[in-house]
Amino acid sequence: MSARENILAKLKKADALPMEEPAVFDYYREMGISWGSEVERLKHWAAAMRAVKTEIYWVTKTSWPQVFRQAAEGKGLKNILLPLATEHGQIARAALVDSNIEPIAFEREIDTWKTEFFSNIDAGFSSSQCGIARTGTLMLFSSPEEPRTLSLVPPVHFCLFDTAKMYNEFHNAVEGEKLVENGIPTNVFLISGPSKTADIQLTLAYGAHGPRDLVILAILPDHISPADLEENA
């Protein structure tokens, strides 16, 4: 028996006790950050995102289509890519009726119109899964209806976010969305602002590796008014 085999044999015979699973979520529940109210938490999230050039519009379930149209027209868009297989995609298309913005369905295989997609599409529109207050972040799930390219390639990304799905921290989002129990989707991504990069001279540039503009339509619950958030938000 070689020295290696001898060592392995001794290890196998040893009375090894199973290691106790660390109480990760209990630790973060105890040590995690919290805010005095929903409004304060939303203000913190908004301040973190606006600090990196994110545009946020506080909207309601009924007002977001109108605000979406106004924001899109304000950017002078010629077209916008919509996930028409979703309810919010259909609502967004209806909001653009009689406007100068052409709604384009995201329904073709990317290889069949790659040149047009990368060269001629002004904006994309998607939903989000949830938000993370501490870091000023949105979590998005890629799906056949809303693939990653919908929010990555166009220079402007409109994102619809239901603030009822706001979590304090990342671990709260993992727990609340049951990512452990249900399995994490193959493509989950966290967005904290438009694409940005810096060269060796530390010159900050937006849009180098993704959208240069991120516009969030943040849907508020009925008991919170947009006016509650605009002051110092």
Where do the language-model regions lie?
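The feature marks the mature, well-folded catalytic cores of soluble enzymes
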Residues: 1-233
